[in-house]
Structures are given as structure tokens and as C-alpha cells.
């Protein structure tokens, strides 16, 4: 079975991704696009500051085909540099500011970055990595602007922008949207060294429009602005179905902008929908809930660990009656968390889970956004416009609805493969346009996708498949368990034993938790039973909210404790 999108195909204009910024500056003008710690930046102000960055890059000889690295947390300076790089016709490579120098150097060298904008606290990693890179310019900024003494061969961002023109240079309009790269986006690296994904302007604009049109019922349009052609949304759906009109949305921005979810969902989509983003550089559940109340946010967004933390602090929340919808990505929301969110925020809350990968720019499926739509808990929704999903067997055969297999994706947002990795590109992207994701999923008869697990996470015990996500959902339903992750311990000819890492509420004692797990084991099939349980302070997650199972495997004690019997 191949599931196809119920949405009409989109007429994506042949324009650079930066046309979104032009359209937003013209349409929303002096309205606030970003708010952080009392400071605001308007849509027009973002265009003007980004234009100054583009002119500064041109003065350095940086333009089409060159790569600019952004090595800083979510902040207005990040957005300015991101859009400025695109206005210059250059390519952005986002880099996690917490990367170790060796990993940062590997990314900068692989991408061929010639300019990097770093955060003051993260600058030492850049300086340590610099000798192994092609960097010609190192820029720095911080929470309070430029540092007083940036250091030798380092330029403060404010000084770099001083005196630059505030109108777009226009060179971005010369790029080929189908060939020129907007992003060299590096994968999350949850299973090893990150790979650079080649994301064109067409991919970025397409996926941003797929998400924005899905959430508003609108269609793309091109408008003439004083800055050049701009892309906007037209003919949105009725307020009775899409209760947040264009230009009225407010959201907390915590998804890291150096990750696909943040780059597209946090930097691009809000410019189409006219959403004000309250920027948080890091996730703090109390601060998140305080700002959600203060700014009367209309939507909550995050990943499952975010919602687990918000639920644990719900007693600190104020009035959240303004919240109309909730979006989640990075991993499937456990059923227990969905039930708790509805109990807290109301049964009419629109909960929309999505599924995607860096290799598809961001999103492949989204839960229906219209109020009256059929939402199916436990699924990650339907294919977005122009997208197909199929489930394939071990030999590439197409499987029927209800059968578990590898998820394949085909659509206009599927990227061009990995940078300088032809063998890995050929293995993941086939000649018919399908991306082989490495995820295990199931399609139902109506095309709703359910993600079962990662193929790499699946355990094999005595010939049986054991899916960690299934065990994790069962563990999260136990009293007092606030976090759960299951990994495998190799045990020779038997394959792997399932091992659980748990976090618990502060008032729950270890004996109670272990007794609950023993009770769960009695209800499981023999090959599913958890052989070890380790209570830890926190489940390690990536910046995108994905559990770092390799870190947990490294924590497995050696030798293993005596395992439970089957």
C-alpha cells in the first residue's frame, strides 16, 4: 500500500527560500516576530538586519556557493544571520553550540565553511577547531551583544553590521532554487558521526509551505513587495476549523534552530503564518509555562520529553485557556502523555504529531490540523501535500496496510542526499525517488502512519523482534515512572536482553518502582521481559529531544547483574 496526501498539491513558486522573509516583512511589517528577554524584533526589522548581514558577507567576498556556519543557541542574532546568509545567496550550515571541538571541526571542515558566527561561551570550541577548517572569518555575539574584547582574529557581530545597507542586495534572486543549497544540515548524530544533508532552496520553501498550508488551510501566493517578490499565504481555511488566524499566533520557541525541526518549524513557518515567537535559548519547564501564560500563547510545541517535563510542573502553570493546539515531533508521544495533556488542557485541544527527518528537510507527515478532522492517537498523521508513504519488506517489497516494515518516503521535500558520501546516499535514496528511512512503521487503511521504532533500536532476542518503544510506553504507564528508555545488552547466541533505564517522581521509592516492573514483566511475553532496571537522574536526550540510546548503552554495568528468568 502507498499512502498519498489528502491535501492538494502545492504550486511552489520558483523562488529562493528568502522570498518568505520578503513576503513577511511586507505583510506583517512592524508586528513582532521575535521576543526574547524583553527585547523585540519586528518582521521588517528582521529583514533590515538580515540585509545588513548579507551586505557584510558580500564585502568579505562570500556569496553563492559559500558556506556560513551558525554556532549559537536560539536568539535574534541567529535569525538575523540565517536569513542574511540566504539573502547573500550563500548556504547555511547550522551547528550545535555544545559540540565538542573535534566534532565541530569535523562538521566545519566537511561543510567547507568560510565564515562562522559563534556564541561567546562557545567560542573556545571554534578557536580550537579552526586550524583544521577553511574558516576565513570568525564572528561572535552573546546574550548582551558583542563581547568587549572578542579576541585576535575575531569580530563582534555588531561591529560587522555597522554601516551596512538595510535593503536586500538582491543576489539571492540569482540562485537556482532547484540546485543551489540553502542548508547543509547535519543529522542529529544519535547513532554516530553526523552526516551533511544537501537541502536546496526548493526543498526549504516547499517544506515550509507544506507545513504552513497544512496548519492554516491556506495556499501559497506570490506578492510584489518593495523588496522584491515575496511568498505569502492566501485563502486560509475558516476560523471555525483553523482557530488561529494568520498573523495572530503566539508560540514559545524551544526547538533548536540548528535542528531541522527548528530551522523549518521555528525560522521559516512562522514567517508565513505571521506568528510571534517567544525565544527560549534552553528549555526550562517553569520558564516555559510562565511565558505561555504571560504571552497567552496559542500553541505549544515540543518533543515528548518536553511534555513530560511540563506535566511534571503543571501545578506552576497559570491560565492556559489561550492554547488551542499542540504539536509534537522527534519521537512518538506515548499514549499516557496524550491522555494527561487532554486532562490538563481540555478535551478539545488539537494535538498534532508529526514525523520527519533531516533527509526530508523536516516534515513528511502531520496530524490533521482542522478542528473537525479525524485524529488518531498513536499515529503521526497523514502525508503532507505531494508526499507518498509506503511500507516495505526486507527485500523492498510493498507491504499491505497493517503490516510492519520500513517506512519509505517520496515527495518534493526529499533532499538530494548526503554531502560527500555517495555510498551512503545510494543506500538511502533510491533511483525511484524513495528515501529508505530506517524506521519501522505501519499504515492503516486510511493512510495514517504509526511509527513502531527505529530499525537500529529494534532488539532481536532468540529470533523474536523486541520493540523498545512498546516497552517504554508500558513503563511510562506505571505509577511514579516519569521517564523510560529501553536498550539491548548483547548476550551471545540469544541476541540481546531488554534493559530499562527509568526516572521516577521524587516521592517514589525504588522498591515500589521495582515491584511495579516485576508486575509488568509477568504480563509480558518471555522474550519481551526486562532483564535489568536502572534508576537514573535523567534520560539523556539530544538537542532535538531524541533519546541518546548510545549514551545509555555506555552506562550498562559490566559484568551485567543477574538477569531475570524467562
Located regions from the model:
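Conserved AMP-binding/adenylate-forming core of the ANL superfamily
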Residues: 13, 32-75, 100-105
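Structural core segment of the AMP-binding/adenylate-forming
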Residues: 59-60, 87, 91-164, 506-509
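AMP-binding/adenylate-forming catalytic core of the ANL superfamily
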Residues: 99, 106, 116-119, 411, ...
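Conserved pre-ATP/AMP-binding loop-to-beta segment of ANL
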Residues: 166-186, 193, 243-250
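Conserved AMP-binding/adenylation subdomain of ANL enzymes
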Residues: 205-253, 258-298, 313
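Gly/Ser/Thr-rich phosphate-binding loop
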Residues: 272-275, 289, 294-302, 311, ...
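AMP-binding/adenylate-forming catalytic domain of the ANL superfamily
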Residues: 522-547, 565-566
Amino acid at each position: 500500500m502507498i499512502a498519498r496526501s489528502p491535501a492538494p498539491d502545492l504550486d511552489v513558486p520558483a523562488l529562493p527560500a528568502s522570498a518568505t522573509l520578503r513576503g513577511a516583512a511586507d505583510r506583517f511589517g512592524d508586528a513582532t516576530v521575535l521576543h526574547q528577554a524583553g527585547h523585540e524584533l519586528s518582521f521588517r526589522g528582521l529583514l533590515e538586519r538580515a540585509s545588513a548581514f548579507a551586505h557584510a558577507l558580500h564585502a568579505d567576498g562570500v556569496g553563492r556557493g559559500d558556506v556560513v556556519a551558525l554556532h549559537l543557541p536560539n536568539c535574534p542574532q541567529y535569525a538575523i544571520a540565517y536569513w542574511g546568509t540566504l539573502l547573500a545567496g550563500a548556504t547555511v550550515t547550522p551547528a550545535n553550540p555544545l559540540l565538542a571541538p573535534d566534532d565541530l571541526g569535523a562538521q566545519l571542515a566537511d561543510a567547507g565553511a568560510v565564515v562562522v558566527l559563534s556564541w561567546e561561551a562557545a567560542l573556545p570550541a571554534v578557536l580550537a577547531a579552526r586550524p583544521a577548517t577553511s574558516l576565513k572569518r570568525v564572528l561572535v555575539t552573546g546574550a548582551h551583544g558583542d563581547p568587549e574584547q572578542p579576541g585576535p582574529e575575531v569580530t563582534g557581530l555588531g561591529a560587522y553590521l555597522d554601516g551596512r545597507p538595510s535593503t536586500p542586495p538582491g543576489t539571492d534572486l540569482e540562485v537556482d532554487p532547484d540546485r543551489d543549497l540553502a542548508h547543509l544540515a547535519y543529522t542529529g548524530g544519535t547513532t554516530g558521526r553526523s552526516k551533511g544533508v544537501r537541502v536546496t532552496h526548493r526543498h526549504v520553501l516547499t517544506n515550509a509551505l507544506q507545513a504552513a498550508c497544512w496548519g492554516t488551510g491556506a495556499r501559497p501566493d506570490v506578492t510584489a513587495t518593495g523588496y522584491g517578490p515575496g511568498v505569502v499565504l492566501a485563502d486560509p481555511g475558516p476560523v471555525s476549523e483553523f482557530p488561529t488566524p494568520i498573523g495572530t499566533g503566539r508560540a514559545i520557541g524551544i526547538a533548536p534552530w540548528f535542528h531541522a525541526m527548528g530551522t523549518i518549524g521555528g525560522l521559516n513557518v512562522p514567517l508565513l503564518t505571521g506568528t510571534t515567537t517567544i525565544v527560549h535559548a534552553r528549555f526550562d519547564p517553569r520558564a516555559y509555562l510562565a511565558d505561555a501564560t504571560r504571552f497567552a500563547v496559542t500553541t505549544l510545541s515540543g518533543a515528548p520529553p518536553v511534555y513530560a517535563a511540563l506535566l511534571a510542573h503543571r501545578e506552576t502553570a497559570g491560565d492556559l485557556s489561550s492554547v488551542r493546539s499542540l504539536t509534537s515531533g522527534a519521537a512518538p508521544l506515548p499514549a499516557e502523555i496524550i491522555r494527561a495533556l487532554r486532562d490538563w488542557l481540555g478535551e478539545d485541544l488539537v494535538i498534532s504529531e508529526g514525523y520527519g527527518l533531516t533527509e526530508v528537510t523536516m516534515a513528511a507527515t502531520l496530524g490533521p490540523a482542522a478542528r473537525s478532522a479525524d485524529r488518531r492517537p498513536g499515529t503521526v498523521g497523514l502525508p503532507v501535500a505531494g508526499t507518498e508513504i509506503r511500507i516495505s519488506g526486507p527485500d523492498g517489497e510493498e507491504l499491505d496496510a497493517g503490516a510492519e516494515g520500513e517506512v519509505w518516503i517520496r515527495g518534493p521535500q526529499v533532499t538530494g542526499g548526503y554531502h560527500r558520501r555517495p555510498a551512503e546516499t545510494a543506500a538511502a535514496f533510491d533511483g525511484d525517488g524513495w528515501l529508505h528511512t530506517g524506521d519501522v512503521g505501519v499504515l492503516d487503511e486510511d493512510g495514517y502512519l504509526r511509527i513502531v521504532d527505529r530499525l537500529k533500536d529494534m532488539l532481536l532476542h532468540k529470533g523474536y523482534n523486541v520493540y523498545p518503544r512498546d516497552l517504554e510506553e508500558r513503563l511510562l504507564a506505571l505509577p511514579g515512572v516519569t521517564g523510560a528508555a529501553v536498550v539491548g545488552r548483547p548476550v551471545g547466541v540469544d541476541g540481546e536482553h531488554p534493559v530499562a533505564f527509568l526516572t521516577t517522581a521524587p516521592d517514589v521509592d525504588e522498591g515500589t518502582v521495582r515491584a511495579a516492573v516485576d508486575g509488568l514483566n509477568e504480563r509480558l511475553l518471555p522474550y519481551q521481559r526486562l532483564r535489568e532496571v536502572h534508576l537514573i537522574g535523567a534520560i539523556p536526550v539530544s538537542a532535538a529531544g531524541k533519546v541518546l540510546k548510545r549514551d545509555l548503552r555506555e552506562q550498562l554495568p559490566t559484568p551485567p547483574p543477574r538477569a531475570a528468568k524467562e
